[in-house]
């Protein structure tokens, strides 16, 4: 009888990934470095409804780090296929759907690390916001980042090679740009960005700080980022399910 969940596999997989130094450099070190660079200007003096500019930079980059971690872990499935690890796991009582659920949970556990580290460093180096704002923004960005675990898994299912990790992680840079994380967008580019997956996650996460304001004249409706995330969860979830059915759950 197949099982949908294995605490032992979840623990082993999470520890294995956290021991990979290169993963930690890109998911934790890079967002921290970018925060220190981007917040070194006048962001601390720029006030927003829920905090200062440094707090917004911190939430955006913590969300980026969490999303990068999730995408890389989802795409790691392609490498595990080549090494035969996925086949070994599926020889146990863990079902293919259960395996996908385990990957999602592993991604969330690992994604919590950059979220906590970046926000913690920010809160102690000039970023100002209430603890309720930090908590709400952090939890929202953390849960929203799971969307990119599905994206990474889909890339792995389509590519079925170790290049999937590079493609998935590299795509996050483009998504982050369109998600209004690296720089404010305007005009037609902003209109396009509203329909991209990272925009929904980043805007929902930063809303406790910005209250939805992108600039002095543009406010994103409360429903829009959640609708965007919901639509992308549906699209990527269905696509992953179809690809898994197409491969017959084979490793």
What name fits each language-model region?
Residues 1-30, 84, 250:
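Aromatic- and glycine-rich beta-strand/loop motifs that create alpha-glucan
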Residues 3-9, 181-223:
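Short hydrophobic, aromatic-rich alpha-helical segments embedded in or entering the lipid bilayer
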Residues 18-44, 54-72, 112-114, 167-177, ...:
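Hydrophobic alpha-helical transmembrane segments of multi-pass membrane transport/permease proteins
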Residues 33, 53-125:
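Hydrophobic alpha-helical transmembrane segments of multi-pass membrane transport proteins
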Residues 37-42, 158-199:
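Transmembrane helix segments
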Residues 48-77, 140-153, 157, 238-241:
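Hydrophobic alpha-helical transmembrane segments of membrane proteins
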Residues 96-166, 222-230, 234-240:
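Alpha-helical transmembrane segments and their short interhelical loops
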Residues 209-213, 226-251:
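Junction motif at the cytosolic side of a transmembrane helix
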């Amino acid at each position: 009888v197949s099982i949908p969940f294995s605490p032992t596999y979840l623990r082993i997989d999470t520890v294995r990934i956290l021991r990979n130094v290169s993963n930690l450099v890109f998911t934790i070190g890079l967002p921290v470095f970018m925060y220190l660079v981007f917040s070194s200007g006048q962001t601390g003096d720029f006030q927003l409804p829920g905090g200062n500019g440094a707090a917004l930079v911190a939430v955006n980059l913590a969300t980026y780090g969490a999303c990068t971690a999730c995408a890389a872990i989802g795409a790691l499935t392609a490498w595990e296929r080549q090494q035969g690890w996925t086949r070994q796991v599926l020889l146990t009582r863990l079902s293919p759907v259960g395996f996908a659920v385990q990957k999602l949970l592993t991604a969330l556990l690992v994604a919590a690390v950059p979220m906590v580290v970046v926000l913690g460093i920010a809160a102690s180096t000039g970023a100002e916001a209430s603890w309720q704002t930090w908590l709400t923004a952090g939890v929202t960005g953390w849960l929203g980042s799971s969307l990119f675990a599905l994206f990474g898994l889909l890339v792995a299912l389509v590519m079925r090679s170790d290049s999937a990790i590079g493609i998935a992680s590299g795509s996050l840079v483009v998504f982050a740009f369109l998600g209004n994380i690296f720089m404010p967008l305007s005009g037609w580019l902003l209109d396009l960005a509203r329909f991209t997956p990272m925009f929904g996650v980043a805007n929902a996460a930063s809303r406790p700080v910005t209250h939805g304001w992108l600039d002095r004249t543009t406010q994103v409706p409360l429903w829009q980022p959640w609708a965007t995330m919901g639509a992308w969860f549906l699209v990527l979830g269905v696509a992953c399910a179809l690809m898994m059915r197409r491969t017959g759950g084979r490793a």
